[in-house]
Regions:
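Short linear loop/turn motifs
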Residues: 10-18, 127-132
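Divalent-metal (Mg2+/Mn2+/Ca2+)-assisted nucleotide/phosphate chemistry catalytic cores
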Residues: 1-6, 12-15, 21, 29
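Short Asp/Glu-rich motifs
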Residues: 18-19, 244
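Active-site core segments that coordinate phosphate-bearing ligands/cofactors
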Residues: 1, 24-207, 216-240, 246-277, ...
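Small/polar loops that bind or transfer phosphate-bearing groups
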Residues: 14, 212, 236
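General small-molecule cofactor/ligand-binding pocket signal
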Residues: 7-13, 38, 233
Length: 295
């Protein structure tokens, strides 16, 4: 225990609880009209998951950005040897749900590689890097995105090349080869995590919903569909903000419940659909990837 007095902390309340109204001095300071204060699904991932426009209550979500937070919603915590082995957590979500998920490295790998090239005097936009990756040879080399060497700032392209050399794979040399290696490796790690979720939940989740800023990397979304062998739906980009708003609208009675909120979001924003391709090639490459990360 910290020894801090309990009275200095606020009450713990469920997401969607109306906590009160703005104090008069706060309204005056910020120039606001009278407004209710409503708790939302915290933190940012909690609100992002509220906004997932899933067609059913059986889905896998990926909140995609610098990190990829992957998981599913359950009615009760999943506490098993397998969940501990796979490093999954159970967090309280909106509407008495459990956010059963884990963090894996995300587009940090591409972001930091881009910064390294900029330090070396070469500037690229993300669409330019994606175009280079499209031109590179497919399914050639893989890394474990969660290897500790990739977790700190620095020369990630060099570290990626060293990893591939150490694991007796073709060494990516061009910018396109490096970015393609990153994106394909992330997609493979998604499949590894998806398979673990299926195992722990005792059923095959039919689809994957990707939300957040990482949905703008459409090549990764297609690779995720290819690797996981299931349909991928992407959007909205501003998932956290929309989930925050949705929780407030439910609390105010403007939207019926979580299911209706997701329907509203699905019908209000462009949701892109990616269908699996090249199944045999990706399945064969996945076997290579699994061997690699288990060594």
């Amino acid at each position: 225990r910290s020894g801090l007095p309990r009275g200095i902390f606020g009450d713990i309340v469920a997401p969607g609880t109306v906590c009160g109204t703005l104090l008069p001095q706060v309204k005056e300071e910020v120039g606001a009209l009278s407004a209710k204060v409503i708790s939302v699904a915290a933190h940012d991932t909690g609100s992002a998951v509220v906004s997932v426009p899933a067609a059913t209550d059986k889905f896998i979500f990926i909140s995609s950005g610098t990190w990829s937070i992957m998981g599913t919603e359950t009615k009760a915590p999943v506490v098993t040897d397998a969940s501990q082995r796979h490093n999954f957590t159970n967090e309280g979500g909106y509407g008495n749900t459990i956010r059963f998920s884990k963090n894996i490295t995300g587009l940090w790998l591409e972001q930091e590689s881009r910064r390294q090239w900029e330090r070396e005097g070469e500037k690229f936009t993300y669409p330019e890097l994606t175009a280079l990756a499209r031109e590179a040879a497919p399914l050639r080399s893989f890394i474990d995105p969660d290897d500790a060497r990739f977790s700190t700032p620095g020369n990630l392209p060099k570290r990626i090349a060293e990893y591939c050399a150490e694991t007796n794979q073709p060494v990516p040399e061009t910018k396109g080869e490096i970015v393609r290696c990153i994106l394909e490796s992330l997609a493979m790690k998604y499949r590894y995590t998806v398979d673990a979720i299926d195992e722990m939940c005792g059923e095959r989740m039919p689809a994957i919903n990707i939300v957040g800023g990482g949905t703008q990397e459409k090549l990764l979304s297609q690779y995720a569909a290819n690797a996981c062998g299931r349909d991928v739906y992407t959007g909205p980009v501003e998932a956290t903000a929309l989930g925050n708003i949705a929780a407030q609208l439910i609390a105010l009675g403007e939207i019926k419940d979580l299911s209706e909120a997701r329907d509203v979001i699905a019908n209000s924003f462009e949701i892109e659909h990616f269908v699996p391709q090249d199944k045999a090639a990706w399945d064969a490459a996945y076997e290579k990837f699994v061997t690699l990360i288990k060594e």
